[in-house]
UniProtKB/Swiss-Prot annotation:
Biological processes per GO annotation: transport of virus in host, cell to cell
Regions crossing the membrane: 12-32, 79-99
Annotated InterPro entries: Plant_vir_prot
Keywords, in A-Z order: Host endoplasmic reticulum, Host membrane, Membrane, Transmembrane, Transmembrane helix, Transport, Viral movement protein
Record GO cellular component, one term: host cell endoplasmic reticulum membrane
Superkingdom, taxonomy of origin: Viruses
Keyword Transmembrane helix assigned: yes
Protein name: Movement protein TGB2
Residue spans, topological domain Lumenal: 33-78
Source lineage: Viruses, Riboviria, Orthornavirae, Kitrinoviricota, Alsuviricetes
Protein species of origin: White clover mosaic virus (strain O)
Length: 117
C-alpha cells in the first residue's frame, strides 16, 4: 500500500502549530521565575534573605533548608518519572496480553494481508 499525502495538509499544519504552541507555553510556565521580587533596584532579594548596611535593613522570608528541600524534590521528581515510565510499559504489556487479536499481533504475519513478509 503506497503512502499518499493527505488531500488537505492544512489540518496537519494546524495540529503542528497547536502542539508547538502548547510546548512553548509549558516551557515558559516551567522555566520562568514566578517568585515575588523583594527589595529595590540596588538590593534585590528574589529568593529571600537578609541585607544590612549603614542606613538600610531588609529581611525577607527564607525557606528553611532550601537546598535540602530542592534535593528532596529532585529525587522525588526522578522517582515519579521512573514510575510513570514503568506504568506505561506495564499498561502497554497488559493491553497486548489481553487484546482480542492477540493471535495476530503476536505472530509474524502481516495484519493487513495475513502473509509472512
Amino acid at each position: 500500500m503506497p503512502l499518499i499525502p493527505p488531500p488537505n495538509p492544512q489540518k496537519t499544519y494546524q495540529i503542528a502549530v497547536l502542539a508547538l504552541g502548547l510546548v512553548l507555553l509549558l516551557a515558559f510556565v516551567l522555566i520562568s521565575d514566578h517568585s515575588p521580587k523583594v527589595g529595590d533596584h540596588l538590593h534585590n532579594l528574589p529568593f529571600g534573605g537578609e541585607y544590612k548596611d549603614g542606613t538600610k535593613t531588609i529581611k525577607y522570608f527564607q525557606r528553611p533548608n532550601q537546598h535540602s528541600l530542592s534535593k528532596t524534590l529532585a529525587k522525588s521528581h526522578n522517582t515519579t518519572i521512573f514510575l510513570i515510565i514503568l506504568g506505561l510499559i506495564g499498561t502497554l504489556h497488559g493491553l497486548h496480553y489481553f487484546s482480542n487479536n492477540r493471535r495476530i499481533s503476536s505472530s509474524l504475519h502481516c495484519v493487513l494481508c495475513q502473509n509472512k513478509h
